UniProtKB/Swiss-Prot annotation:
Protein name: Flagellar P-ring protein
Keyword S-adenosyl-L-methionine: no
Gene, per the UniProt record: flgI
Molecular function in Gene Ontology: structural molecule activity
Keyword field: Bacterial flagellum, Periplasm, Signal
Subcellular location, principal: periplasm
Native source species: Gluconobacter oxydans (strain 621H)
Subcellular location: Periplasm; Bacterial flagellum basal body
Length: 380
């Protein structure tokens, strides 16, 4: 006698389906959340490893009549004359006849990444400094880029890509995006590098992008479990690494790939201008009663003409007619929000009251003032 029948699915397929079913069921349970683990290198920076900002001043040529008006932008005219003079073209005696509209003075900016070497290329951004209406189709002439110390670290040149257009006629014009700012991919060549020797560093600091004691402790804990006692938490932002007995490059590579679960503070960010509200998952409120309603006063002016009868000797006059209407909005009941309410429950409860984003901002401010909002409220 046989007690088993052959299943239409292989055992491995059934196992996978049961596992998926259990996982989906857990996700549907109230209050069940999955903490997201991230790599250490995605939430920290290494001390001393950073980019440096560069800036320069130059000329863009080849514009189709959309450049600076030389009579208004004196610096553009002087820069053009000086550049032509360096190239052996002397027009000082005829500078008043210089009437071109195909040149624009621009500011050039770029970021010099860490560990970059001479000859490497970087992206540059070009922005109009004068009254040019568009930089579309222009070419940036060779422009030195300096850092805050006044030294030249890169040189930029190339054709601009603006991702915009501008057209105008006798009575109308149209502009899409920002034609007075452009981008040159790989338009800068590094001439000087910032020295940074990582191979001989005995100590190194990891800097958290979002300072937090819990996250810093978790980072130090996972590093110490993997490499031994080499990590010490100095403050909520800094974890000190002792690499004296390790190869810094390979060790930092392995540390960066370690997974850690960052702790997020209970925080509510409100943008009053746009009505945007961002609330973290750990936001809680104590027991509080909420009632919300709107008051709208509408004043309508309807002027009427008063016409006197024939031969009455009266004069025609405009008589104002004012209608005032008060609307208190639909009636909302007083709702009691229990203590320990989560983000989902809070939003659902406020939506049940018919509360919009802007009204929700006022309610959150009132709850915070009452001391019932157990989170930081940041207004922007």
């Amino acid at each position: 006698m046989r007690f088993f029948t052959q299943s239409p699915f292989p055992l491995r397929t059934l196992t996978r389906r049961l596992t998926a079913f259990v996982c989906v069921g857990l996700l549907l349970l109230p209050g069940f959340t999955l903490a997201a683990s991230v790599r250490i290198k995605d939430i920290t920076d290494m001390e001393g490893v950073r980019s440096n900002q560069l800036i320069g001043y130059g000329l863009v040529v080849g514009l189709n009549g959309t450049g600076d008006r030389l009579t208004n932008t004196i610096f553009t005219r002087e820069t053009l004359i000086s550049m032509l003079n360096r190239l052996g073209v002397n027009i000082r005696d005829q500078e008043t006849q210089l009437q071109t509209h195909d040149v624009a003075a621009v500011m050039v900016t770029a970021d010099l990444p860490a560990f970059v070497h001479g000859g490497n290329r970087i992206d540059v951004t070009v922005s109009a400094a004068g009254d040019a209406s568009s930089l579309t189709g222009g070419t940036l002439l060779v422009t030195p880029l300096m850092a805050a110390d006044g030294e030249v670290y890169a040189v930029a040149q190339g054709s601009l890509a603006t991702n915009a257009f501008s057209a105008r006629g006798a009575a109308a014009s149209i502009t899409r995006n920002v034609p007075t700012s452009g981008h040159i991919a790989n338009g800068g060549i590094v001439e000087r590098e910032v020295p940074f020797d990582l191979s001989h560093r005995a100590n190194l600091h990891l800097s958290l992008r979002n300072p937090d004691f819990t996250t810093a402790s978790r980072i130090a804990s996972i590093i110490n479990r993997t490499f031994g006692p080499i990590a010490i938490v100095q403050d909520p932002r800094t974890v000190l690494l002792d690499l004296s007995n390790h190869d810094p490059v390979s060790t930092l590579s392995r540390i960066g790939d370690l997974l850690v679960t960052p702790d997020t503070p209970a925080k509510v960010v409100v943008d009053e201008a746009s009505g945007t509200i961002i609330m973290g998952a750990d936001v809680r409120i104590s027991t509080v009663a909420v009632a919300q309603g709107n008051l709208t006063v509408q004043v309508t002016e309807t002027p009427q003409v008063s016409q006197p009868g024939p031969f009455s000797g009266g004069q025609t006059a405009v008589v104002p007619r004012t209608n005032v209407k008060v609307d208190t909005g639909k009636t909302h009941h007083l709702a009691v929000v229990p203590g320990g309410t989560t983000l989902r429950e809070l939003v659902s409860g406020l939506n049940a009251l018919g509360v919009g984003p802007r009204d929700m901002i006022s309610i959150l401010q009132a709850i915070k003032a009452d001391g019932a909002l157990q989170a930081e409220l940041e207004m922007r």
